[in-house]
Amino acid sequence: MKHMWSEEEIQEQASIENLVDSKGRNRFIEIESTPGERDGMQINYGKCVLNGNNLIFEIQGNFTKNIAPDFTLCKFTLPEWIAQKIILGFANVVDLSPYSLISTDGVVETSLYCIYKEGNILNFSQYTGVNAPSLTVFKIRYNLIISK
């Protein structure tokens, strides 16, 4: 059975999306990605959402051929006040994480992506090479907790 939203629930959701902190900055923000340019790669969806203290990233795309390592999947340009709250792991690296690549012929491969911080830009980069003998799809979901 489909849930029908009451007027009160709609107003509550709207108030959450308009939430601001003590400095008047929105705590619900949506940011579109800038896809990287690499032959054999396509980013179909890239979005980042700040929801309170959670900075949530989702990237979906595909590869159509083998690709050497170290290239940009996509970038997110963040407001300066959010970028200042991101703590680096080492050098300019925020994190290095695994994700799955699934080809149309059923082959599953684990690969690594790295998140670099360059000023107020977060760069999601392919850290390892990609073995994509056929159309290979991927989805990255990453949640980063930022301080208040």
List PLM regions with ranges.
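Extracellular jelly-roll beta-sandwich "head" domains, especially the C-terminal globular C1q domain
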Residues: I43, I67-K75, K85-K148
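Short, low-complexity N-terminal tether/leader segments at secretion or assembly junctions of large
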Residues: M1-G24
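N-terminal cationic leader/targeting segments used for protein routing and processing
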Residues: H3, G52-N54, I140, L144
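Extended extracellular/luminal ectodomain segments enriched in beta-structured repeat modules
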Residues: G52-I56, K85-I86
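Intrinsically disordered, low-complexity regions enriched in polar/acidic and amide residues
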Residues: I10-E12, A83, S125
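Surface-exposed ligand/attachment interfaces on beta-rich extracellular proteins
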Residues: R25-G52, N62-W81
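Beta-strand residues in well-ordered beta-sheet regions across diverse protein folds
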Residues: I56-Q60, S125
